[in-house]
Regions:
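Long, highly charged, low-complexity intrinsically disordered interaction regions
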Residues: 230-332, 337-360
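Divalent-cation
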Residues: 1-262
Length: 360
C-alpha cells in the first residue's frame, strides 16, 4: 500500500463520512433499495470509458443524487462532489484489467478506478452496502456504531501506551540529569513514541470515517497526543550520531527510518538504535551516551527555538549546560542577564523534579 494511495483513500472517506452531503445521498439510495455507480472526477481518462448519458452540470444535492440513481447507468460528479456532471452514462472499462469482484456493478467500479485513477463508489442493491474503490483498493463503509466501538478500543489502548511513554520519558530525563544514559534507555523512549504515533494514526483513520460523529473522540485524541511528535524530534536531535564524511545523515533521515520500521523490527531495540546512527548490534545498547540538551531546554518556558540551538551549540552537551552559571549563559548570543537567570532557574527546577519523580 503506497502512501499516496493511503492519502487518496482517506480523502475519499472524508468526503463520504457522516455529516457530508454525499453520505446523505448514499444513505438515501440505500434506504430506497436501489443501486448506484458514482465516479468522482472527470477528465480525458473518464471520457475514454464513458458512453451515452446526458450532461447536467448542476450543483450537487443528496436528493438529486437519489433521484438520478433510479435511472440506469452511472453518475459522474466532479472531484470534490460539488457538481453533478453527467447521469445515465454507460461505463466501459478495459475488461482485461484484473478484479476479484463478482457483481457486474462492483467489477465495473473496480476496473474504472484502476484504469482512470479516479475514485468510484458502488452502492449494492442486493447486499445493501456501499463500497469505495481507490487505486485498486476496496473499502466498504460501515455503520458508525461499529466504527465508534473500534475507535474507543483503540483510544483506550493509546491511553495505556501514552502512560507508558510518559513513564519512560521521565526516567530518561532523570538519567540525563545524572549523566548515566545508555543507548537502550534512548531506544525504549523512541520505541514507545513510535508505538503511540502508530495507534494515533489508526484512531485518526476511524475519525475520518466517523465524520461529524467523531468530534468528541477527536478532542480526546488531540489532547492525548499533544507534543508527542515534537518530543520525538527533540529525542532524535539529542542522540543522533553525527554524520561522517562518507554518509550525510540528518534528523529527518532518522525519523523516516524509525517510521519505516515494521511492527516486528520496532520491537528490536538494535534496529531502533540503527535509526539513530548506531551500529545494529546488541552490544551497543549498553553503550553510554550523552544528550545534547534539546529535550531539557525545550521544557524551559518562554525560550525560543533559535536560542535553544545557540545554547546547545555553545555548550555542546547537557552536562556542561547543567554546570553552567548565569555568567556562562550570558556568553551565548541573544542571552541577556534576565534570560540567563530564567534558563538557570528553569534547568535547576527541572533537574530537581526529574530526580524526585524517579525516586519518589
Amino acid at each position: 500500500m503506497s502512501i499516496e494511495s493511503d492519502v487518496r483513500m482517506r480523502e475519499v472517506l472524508a468526503m463520504v463520512a457522516p455529516g457530508t452531503a454525499l453520505r446523505d445521498g448514499l444513505e438515501r439510495i440505500l434506504r430506497g433499495r436501489t443501486g448506484a455507480l458514482i465516479v468522482l472526477g472527470s477528465d480525458r481518462s473518464i471520457d475514454q470509458v464513458v458512453n451515452g448519458g446526458f450532461a447536467l452540470d448542476v450543483a450537487f444535492s443528496a436528493t438529486r443524487l437519489r433521484e438520478l440513481s433510479k435511472m440506469d447507468g452511472a453518475i459522474i460528479l466532479d472531484g470534490q462532489a460539488q457538481q453533478i456532471l453527467w447521469a445515465a452514462v454507460q461505463l466501459m472499462p478495459d475488461p482485461s484489467l484484473p478484479t476479484d469482484e463478482t457483481g457486474t456493478r462492483h467489477r465495473t467500479a473496480d476496473r474504472v478506478s484502476r484504469q482512470t485513477r479516479h475514485p468510484v463508489i458502488a452502492v449494492s442493491k442486493s447486499m445493501n452496502i456501499v463500497a469505495v474503490y481507490v487505486d485498486g483498493r476496496r473499502h466498504v463503509l460501515e455503520e458508525s456504531a461499529e466504527i465508534l466501538s473500534r475507535a474507543n478500543q483503540a483510544l483506550a489502548t493509546l491511553e495505556r501506551y501514552k502512560s507508558r511513554l510518559d513513564e519512560v520519558s521521565s526516567t530518561l530525563s532523570a538519567l540525563e540529569i545524572e549523566d548515566v544514559v545508555t543507548v537502550r534507555d534512548v531506544c525504549v523512549v523512541a520505541q514507545r513514541s513510535e508505538m503511540v504515533r502508530r495507534i494515533h494514526h489508526e484512531v485518526n483513520n476511524y475519525l475520518v470515517e466517523l465524520g461529524t460523529e467523531g468530534r468528541l473522540l477527536s478532542l480526546q485524541l488531540n489532547e492525548l497526543v499533544a507534543g508527542v511528535d515534537k518530543d520525538r524530534m527533540l529525542l532524535m536531535r539529542d542522540y543522533l550520531v553525527p554524520a561522517s564524511n562518507r554518509r550525510k545523515r540528518g534528523v529527518d533521515n532518522g525519523l523516516e527510518e524509525l517510521d519505516s520500521l515494521s511492527e516486528v523490527d520496532l520491537l528490536d531495540l538494535a534496529r531502533v538504535a540503527k535509526a539513530f546512527g548506531f551500529p545494529e548490534t546488541a552490544e551497543v545498547l549498553d553503550q553510554s551516551v550523552t544528550p545534547r540538551g534539546y529535550r531539557l531546554l525545550a521544557r524551559v518556558p518562554r525560550l525560543p527555538d533559535v536560542i535553544n540551538d545557540r545554547i546547545v551549540g555553545h555548550f555542546g552537551g547537557l552536562p556542561r549546560l547543567l554546570a553552567a552559571t548565569t555568567e556562562d549563559l550570558q556568553q551565548v548570543e541573544g542571552v541577556g542577564e534576565a534570560r540567563a537567570r530564567s534558563v538557570r532557574d528553569g534547568l535547576s527546577r527541572l533537574a530537581e523534579a526529574s530526580i524526585l519523580d524517579r525516586f519518589v
